[in-house]
Structures are given as structure tokens and as C-alpha cells.
Amino acid sequence: MCQETPPRPRAPSRWTPALLALLALGGAGLCHASSQPGYHARPSARNKNWCAYIVNKNVSCTVQEGSESFIQAQYNCPWNQMPCPSALVYRVNFRPRFVTRYKIVTQLEWRCCPGFRGPDCQEGPKDHMKTPRPPSARPKNNLKKATDTDPSQVSQPKKTLSPTNAVEPGQVADAKQGPPELQQSKVQVLEEKVVRLTRMVLDLQSTVVGLKENLKHTIQDDGRKEPDSWLGPLHPQPTPDSPLAGDAEPSQLPGIPSSKESGMKDIKSELAEVKDTLKTKSDKLEELDGKVKGYEGQLKQLQEAAQGPTVTMTTNELYQAYVDSKIDALREELMEGMDRKLADLKNTCEYKLVGLQQQCDDYGSSYLGVIELIGEKEASLKKDIADLRAQLQDPVAQPSCCNGQKSSDFGPQIKALDQKIERVAEATRMLNGRLDNEFDRLSVPEPDADFDARWTELDARINVTEKNAEEHCFYIEETLRGTINGEVDDLRKLLNEKIHSLEDRLGIVLQAANSSDVELTPMGPALPEQPGAENEQVLMELSRLKDKVQVVEDFCLQSLPHGIDGALPSVEDLTHVSLSLLESLNDTMHRQFQETSHSIQKLQEDVNALHSQLNHSECTGTYLQNGVSDSRTGDSMEASGFTKTGEQERTVGTVPSPGTPAAPCCGQLEERWQKLQNQMLAELDTCKESAHGVQSGVSAIEGRVFQLEQTCRRLDTISGSLQRIKEGLGKHVGSLWNCIRQMNGTLKSHSRDISGLKNSVQQFYSHVFQISTDLQDLVKFQPSATEEPSEATEGPSGKTPLESTRPSEEAPTEPPRLTPLPEDPAGPPQTGQQPVLPQRPLQPPPLPAWPGRTGLPFLPGSSGVIMETGEAGPPGRMGVSGRGLPRGVDGQMGQGPIHSSEGYAGAPGYPKSPPVTTPGVPLPTLVSFSAGLTQKPFPSDGGVVLFNKVLVNDGDVYNPNTGIFTAPYDGRYLITATLTPERDTYVEAVLSVSNASVAQLHTAGYRREFLEYHRPPGAVHTCGGPGAFHLIVHLKAGDGVNVVVTGGRLAHTDFDEMYSTFSGVFLYPFLSHL
């Protein structure tokens, strides 16, 4: 709905009559805001002192800006029911909202042509007219000058002279024109056009006179109509194809008289005043409308603040937000619970480890005490046995009187005892070794050991112990209950028997007492002789019986109220009895241990006594041996004859006989040896019992050691399987690394090939660009020979002044099209180019590889240089380019000095020389980078974004620590960046090149001034999606490129996910260096 006119770049020759007609009528004012002279009228146009220029104009447009809600009242009436109920239904509907916007359009405006000046553009550069001119007044602008706020400022084109007073074309021509034949032909053409246009102007003047005559009648008839309708016949309606736009106003020609000119001027002045008034009113209305809209916006904000925030999200977004919040809360709760659980488990493990360490220390100390005790006992036993063995060896070796059958029986027993003691000592040593190993293992807790199995084993053992204790308690309780019940039953039976016996005896006594008087005489012999003593005895017996009966009665009376069950002990009593029994068992075991220790001490004392007795026996044996030796000497003396009666008697009286004095000694020794044997047997039984207890403990320890060995074997198997798994994983990882190395090598080779292809393509592009530049130069230097006579006003030696003042405007705006390469790969590659001037081949270009290049670009990886020489092609056919120049299509860079229907064959091209590297310019290499953001980009609210995750960094041109890409070469670079804000926020960023802003980005969109939008301050920012930079920039070597965030919040995650990226690639070097 924009009120605009399509722009026209320039008025062609076929529009000249229409332009002249509109000029004759006065023309219509056109908008001339910010005029830009870009083009001028053709030289053959009539009245060349006025020219149409292209200008820009601000126009107002009504555009749709969203929608607004309104409440609509509806009657809830059924179909065909005339008496409709009065109940109204209010519904909320939406309608589009339109606002007024401004835009810039391009239109035409009349101004003085170049070379003309003056108020009416009638003064030319060399205007020496001798004929007088009538005064030509500048057409007045009847409309009021527009203010700055009015975008449609109107200006009228100037009036032109009559055809009779027009300046001839030959008067404006320059003296340095072409030959007279061309000028004469051009003048003839112009004269014909002037005659034709003069005839058309006369017809238009007659039409205007008729219109003015009809104006008088129209004003009289339609005086009550609006003033705008009065000028309806005078305003020509613009058409879409019309070169002009706007309201046309009538203009009086100077040669035509009018009687109503003053009235028309008054009407125009009144119309202008009315328009000004309406414009003022409309401005005020617009201002008032803006204020009302501002007040409405403020009222809406107040209502929203009073009612609370309105829901602007959809149902799915609300559900998604609710689910996200719940998931976040659940995640936080799970993490907190896991942290607490881990902390509790850690504390529990530490507490259990401390308890286990303490328990191991206690076990170690107790085991050490047992080891010391056993060692002491073993040492003492070894010492005693050694002493006993040393004492027994000497008497056994010497012959004595006691060597008999019993001594021969006592030797094997002593040997058996020694063997048993040896076995006990060996078992004790083995037990000590095992205990030492166990203490060494338990004293130092293993940090990597798995205590779960041990805790499980301890729990199982504790459970088994508790179960056994409970079963034992139940067994003791049942046993005690049965025993107590049996004892009570026996007691009751015994009491009943005694009571029955007492009753019987009492009955007998009473019966005897009663019958004592009647049967006194027959019983007299049976009674004792003393009646007093008998009575006393009976009374004593009766009193004793009474006492017993009283005791039994008291006992029965005490047990009767409680019944039989009352006499039984309760569970607590039984438990107490069980505890007392256990304590008694423990005391018994302790007492037995003490008794064992006492018996061992007693055994030691007996051994000492035996030692002393053996010493005494040895003394006795020595005495007996001396006596035997004396008796032998006595016999020898008696045999030799030296006998004396007194000496023989003394010898016989002194030396006892072998039978008489030796018998009591041997009897005492036999008794002592019997006592010693009995004592040793008793001690041996005690040692056996102790050995059985130790053996049971050793068997328990062996069972535990066996369980540990089984657990270790299982752990060994598990560790072996884990080792095999580890080895398999190591082999698999090694194979994967080998594959990765192979892939890296393949990628490197592919990268080299791609880089070679890329360099070749860049070199080909540079060659094509150079060829297009050469073609443009050729087009500029070639003369034109196909223009019409009306346009061929310039000679081969120069141009007209008008064209010399604007050399840049005559250049073609589009580059010439290049002939594509032949598709046949077998044929020689040729490039269709423009023929050059004759002088151009004499001066080789600075880079001769491009004009005469006939080969294809370098292939990747080729190291050699292809040297080819262009051959002369066949004659080319006539081809017309954009500027009318002939061109040999099939020939190569040949010469075309003569314009004919058929071109000559092209000359051979220049041989290709190797490219010359510009000194001081490094050869470009592969440069590209790509990085993403996975962490917080900067510590503060804004700054340079540090894209930390580098994906590609060829050439090491990007520094993730600073977030800056440094260009290594001069050339063109493609820079891209994608920035994603957090939800419900925005991001405002700048792409900076060498600390200079190149592009800006705001994800919420660009925001204009509030005066233009009529929005109140404090409007809410509209959040948008991600934003991106994507542009090609020219960078010099050493320039730094980075992304700077100036507002908002940039999204980042902690899970190695990229939402924002920054990339760049080197396209090609700067063309001036190639």
C-alpha cells in the first residue's frame, strides 16, 4: 500500500513526445529529496537545457504489524428466532494492526543539464544568440514549501520556450566535432523530429484552450463541490507506464491569453491554504494518535503489572518447562542423596576399618600372649625332659641291683613318653609358625583387600555363634526344667512316703497307747523293765513326730496356694540358673587350667624330688659297690691264707649279705619308681587332655586357613581372568591405535591432495579474473562502429565534453562473458578471448602465463611445469559483443585490425613461463580453523569469547587461550560464527577485526528509535534464537579476528556439547600479488 512510483533510469527516445507534452502543460512536481545526479539526457533530445535526474523520495506505507485483541458482543440468537433474548455473549477476537512506515523510493526530477545555468537554465556555455527572446518566467510553485516533516516535497519542472524560439542543435555543438557530413545528417534528423514535435505541441495547445473554456462552465455548475474536484479535468491521471508521477498542475503557456488567470491563482492559493490546514490537522492528529497509543501502552503495562505476568508461551512450552523444572529438581535431589549416601558409606567404612584394626590389634596381643605362654611351657618341658633324660642315662648304663623286669618295662614307656612329647613339641612348633604367619597377616591391614568377604564371614560366624548359644540355652533350659520337675516329683513322692509311714507309725502308737490299759498284763514281758524310761522314750518319739508333721504341714501349706506350677521355677530363674551354670562352667575351666598349671608345677617338684632320690640312690649304689668290693677283697685275702679271726669276724659283721640288706633298698626304689610312674601317667593324661584342647583349636584354625586358601584360589582365578581380559583389551586398543594411525595417514594424504586441488582452483580463478580484466581493458580501448548517426557524435580521436566529464559512467556495469572451454578432452584446449590491439603483442604482459595460457590448471601433486605454445587457429566468424566489437570465436589471441565480415587467423600465443613469485610475499599454505564453546566463555558479563574446544586448526592460526584468529597472509578469508543465547535471554555481539567492529549481531533483532515507533520507555525486549556471522573479509598479515559479546548471556554446557562455534578459512591471496 505504498504510494510510490517505479523508478526509471533514463528517458529513451520513444518517450520524447510525452515528455514534451507534459512540459508544455507545465509538468507535475516531483519529489527531490537527496537528489543524486546519475544519468543525463541523450544529446538528440529536444530542449536539452532541462534534464531528468534520478532522485530518492521518502514515501509512507501502511504495513501490518502483528495483531491485537478486542472484545466483541454477540447476540446468542437461534436461527429464525425474531424475539432474540437480551443476553449478550462477549468473545475475544483478533484483528490485524496496521502502522505507518516510511521507505525510500527512486523517481525522476527535472534539473539543468550539464553546461547550462541560470534561473531558467537558458544560459549555455557559448550562447551567442542574436535574435531577441521573449521574457520567459520560471514556472511558479503554487504549493507551499514542504517542511522537514513532510516527506513529499514537490518541485515543478521549468517552462520551456516556444518552438519558434528554441535554440538550434547546431548552436550547442562543439567546434571539435566530426566531419560535416555526419553533422549535416544529424541536423536533418533533428529538424524532422522538431517539426513533428511542433505539430504535436500545437495540437496540445488547442486541447488546453478547449479545457480552459470548459473550466468556466465546470466551476459555475459544480461550485458547491470540493475544491479538489474543480481541477479534476486539469490533472492528468498517471499510469504505471508513465515516466512521471504525482499530481499535475495546469501551467499557462506564454503565447496563449487567458481571462481567468487571476481567478485560477486565487483558487490555487485557497487550495494551498486548505492543504496546509489539512496537513497541520493531520500532523496534530498523528501526534495525538501517538500520545494515545503511548498512554494505551502504559495502561496495558499497569494492567499486566496488576494482574501478574501474562502467559505468552504455548501449552507445549509450558509442559516442557514444567517437565524440565521437575527433572532438574529430581536431578538435584538424586545428586544430593548420592552425596549423602556416599558420605555415609565412607564414614561407615572408615569406622569399620578402625574397628577392624583395633580388633586385629587385640587379637594380635592375645595371640602373642598365648605364643609366649606356650613358648615358656615348651621351654620348661624341654628343660625338664632333658634333665630327666640326663639323670636316667647314668643309672641305666651302670649295672645295679634294681635292673630287673620292671626296669626293662619302664624303658619302653619312657621312650614312648619321649616320642609323644616330641610329637607334642612338633605340633606346638607348627602351631606357633601358623600363628606367627596369621599374626603377621592380621597385624598389617591390606589397603586393597576386599573386606566385604571378611565382614560376611564374620557376620556368618556371629550368626552361627548366636544360633549355637541359643540352642545351647534352650537345651540347658529344657534339661534344667526336666531335672527340676523330676526332682520335685521325687521330693513329692518322698514326702508322701514319709507322711504315710509317719501316719502308720502314729496310728500304731495311738493304738498301742489306747490298748495299753486293757492289755497291760500280756504286754508286760515285751516292755522294758523300767516304766518311767519307757514313757519318756515314747514322749520323746511323739514330740519328734509332731515336729516332723508340723514341718511337713508348713511346707504343704506354703506350696498349696500356688499350686504345682508355682513350685516350678520361672523362665527368668531358669535363665539365671543357666547363666550361673555357664559361669560355673567357666570357673570350672579356669580352675582346671589352674589345677593343670599346679599339676605341672607339682610334676616339676616331683621331678626334682626324683632327681634327689636318684642322687640318694646313686649314693646308696656307691655304698653297695664299695661293700661288694670289700667283700671281694676279703674273699681274696681268705683265699691267699692271710686270715685273721678278728678281721674275718669284723668283715662278716660289717659287710651285709647280698640277700639281707639289699632287699629293703630295692623295695624302696621300686615303690618310688611305681609312684613316679603313676604320677607320670597322671601327668601324661593331663597333657593329653590339654593336647586335645590345643588340637581342637588348631583344627579350627586349620579350617579357617583352609577357607582363606580357597578364597585366595578363587581370587587367583579371578585375577587371572582379569589379566587375560586386560591383555585382550590391550591388544584391541593397540589394533585401534594402528587403525587410527592409518586413518591419520590417509587423511593427511587426502588433505595434501585437496590442498593441491584448492591451490589449482585458486590459481585458475585468478587466471580467469585476470582474463576478464584484460577483456574489460580491450573493450575500453576498442572504437565503436555500429552506432546510429544520432548517437555517433564522437570521433575516433576523442569524446564530447559531456562524456569527458563522466568517464566512469560510460564503463559497462557487467563483465563480458567468456567463451567456455571445449568439452572435447581430445582436442587442444582453447580459450575464446577478445582480439587485442596491434601494439599489444609487442609488449609482453607482466605475467605472460595468462594471455597465452592454453593448458589446464596444475593437477595436485604435479611438480613439473607445463610449457605449451599457442598455434594459429582457423579464421573466426563475425561476432558482436556488448559494445559492438568484432571477436574471433574459434581463434585464440589473434589480431583484428580490420573490421570485416570474416576475421583473420589469430597469431600464436606466448609460451607459458613458470610463475614468478613476488619478492617479500610468502607462498600461501593451508589455513583453516574451527572451534566450539563447551565452558563459560569469560569470567565477567562480557568480553572476548574463548572458544575452547578446537576441532580444526590448520596452520596453528587460532589461539584458544585468547580466542583470537591471526591471519598469516594477505587475502580473502571466510569467517563464520554461530552464537546461541541461553533460554529466555538474548546475545549482543560484535565481530572485531584488529580491534575494529566489522559486523554487529543481536538475537532479539534490530531496534529503532522510540520516536519512530511511538513506544513508551521500558518496553520488554523480545528474545530470539541463535545468531550467526557469515561474511568474507579482506585481512592483512597479522590482523586478529575475534568475537566480542557486549550484552546478554551466551549458552554453555558442562557435557562437552557445542552450541556456539567460530570458524574461518583462507580462500585465496590478494590478487595484486599474483
From Swiss-Prot:
Where is this protein found?
Answer: Secreted, Extracellular space, Extracellular matrix
Q: Domain Collagen-like: where?
A: 852-913
Q: What is its main location?
A: secreted
Q: Could you say which residues form the signal peptide?
A: 1-33
Segments of this protein annotated with the region Disordered: 121-184, 219-264, 627-661, 783-865, 893-917
Could you tell me where the Basic and acidic residues compositional bias lies? 219-228
Q: Which PROSITE patterns match?
A: C1Q (PS50871), EMI (PS51041)
- Record's function text: May be responsible for anchoring smooth muscle cells to elastic fibers, and may be involved not only in the formation of the elastic fiber, but also in the processes that regulate vessel assembly. Has cell adhesive capacity. Major component of the cochlear basilar membrane (BM) which may contribute to the developmental assembly or function of the BM.
Tell me the protein's name: EMILIN-2
